[in-house]
Amino acid sequence: MIPRPHGGKLVNRIVSSKRRTALLKETHELPSIEISYERLIDLLDIANGAFSPLEGFMVQEDYLHVLYDMRLSNDLPWTIPVILDVDPEEISNVKEGDDIALKYKDEIYAIMRVEEIYGWDKKEYARQVYKTTDPNHPGVAKTYQRKELLLGGTIDLLNQPHHPLEHRILWPIETRVLFREKKWRTIVAFQTRNVPHRGHEYVQKAALTFTDGLFIHPLIGWKKPGDYRDEVIFAAYEALIKHYYPDNVVVLAGLMMNMNYAGPREAVHHAIVRKNFGATHFIVGRDHAGVGDYYKPYEAWEIFDEFPDLGITPLFIREAFYCKKCGGMVNEKICPHGEEYRIRISGTKLREIIKKGITPPEYMMRPEVAKVILSFKDPFVH
């Protein structure tokens, strides 16, 4: 049964076309602030219901509850603060209770009702969210670059930005209809920012054996250098689905969402977001949303013990490897053979092979997938 959205109601903060014309006229009278591309993506996730029950950027009470308790002030699970940072001089003429226009590259995208202006401790944010204050962590580095004050308040979205992959993006209101049309009662979601290798395929198919449908949901948004480009990920998955999945058991759609690399906290966040899209189950990977050695391999599994009231079932499927003796993809639970027979698939090693223009061996990646990736002149983010 498709779950109710987080908090019970799917948020929609998109202004109707009738109201939009009047509000756009009003925006010229309002103070405005320029926001970053990452905050524009947050705006879209709030307005389109991906971040339900949030209706805007967090006020201080919710921010502090999430920071220290991993719950909103109403006790609903929520693990990553969704905040709008500004410099004091940008809001010198703004007070609590005012409406402001939010712009990106001088185009107005939303109106925000400023409920609260408050300060924050970036180092403490990093310590709680990322479990490290090391500026070499990409999420921590981003945090330290953010501005000094935070604005909390509800938003109304006036414009959706164009994106070269917008035809790939579905929002919760669309996926919920789609899953119902397919008559899927159980849907397992798979979060990714990578092209698929045989280990991913193994995990997805293991989950699909006891659910009605698989929802492959790659992130479109800020990625770190060395990650695969969005269009490469989609093309690679299309090849995999075409050649190695039965018809009508997979939905592939993009999600505009920022990647924080916040490990365990972000694993829970990813699950909540997929619940809003209509998923009943969520695959949690080994070192999910991790980076480097900042988190223990299965720390992202353990955190779910703190959230029995999440409303989506996490699936912990062990990392797959190729066993020469078994003759296929297996994991530690089902393979009795020693390490000398096991070939582990490393994403880093795969990248190195692809960077050299070499086709990876079949036990690492399907040849049809490799062919598509290698057809791109440069598959990586710089």
UniProtKB/Swiss-Prot annotation:
One of its GO terms (biological process) is sulfate assimilation. Coiled coil: none annotated. Its EC number is 2.7.7.4. Keywords: ATP-binding, Nucleotide-binding, Nucleotidyltransferase, Transferase. It comes from the Archaea. It catalyses: sulfate + ATP + H(+) = adenosine 5'-phosphosulfate + diphosphate. InterPro entries: ATP-Sase_PUA-like_dom (IPR025980), PUA-like_sf (IPR015947), Rossmann-like_a/b/a_fold (IPR014729), SO4_adenylyltransferase_pro (IPR020792), Sulfurylase_cat_dom (IPR024951), Sulphate_adenylyltransferase (IPR002650). GO terms for molecular function: ATP binding; sulfate adenylyltransferase (ATP) activity. It is an enzyme of class 2 (transferase). SUPFAM superfamilies: Nucleotidylyl transferase, PUA domain-like. Pathway: Sulfur metabolism; hydrogen sulfide biosynthesis; sulfite from sulfate: step 1/3. HAMAP family: Sulf_adenylyltr. NCBIfam families: PRK04149.1, sopT. Belongs to the sulfate adenylyltransferase family. This is Sulfate adenylyltransferase. It comes from Staphylothermus marinus (strain ATCC 43588 / DSM 3639 / JCM 9404 / F1). The lineage of its organism: Archaea, Thermoproteota, Thermoprotei, Desulfurococcales, Desulfurococcaceae.
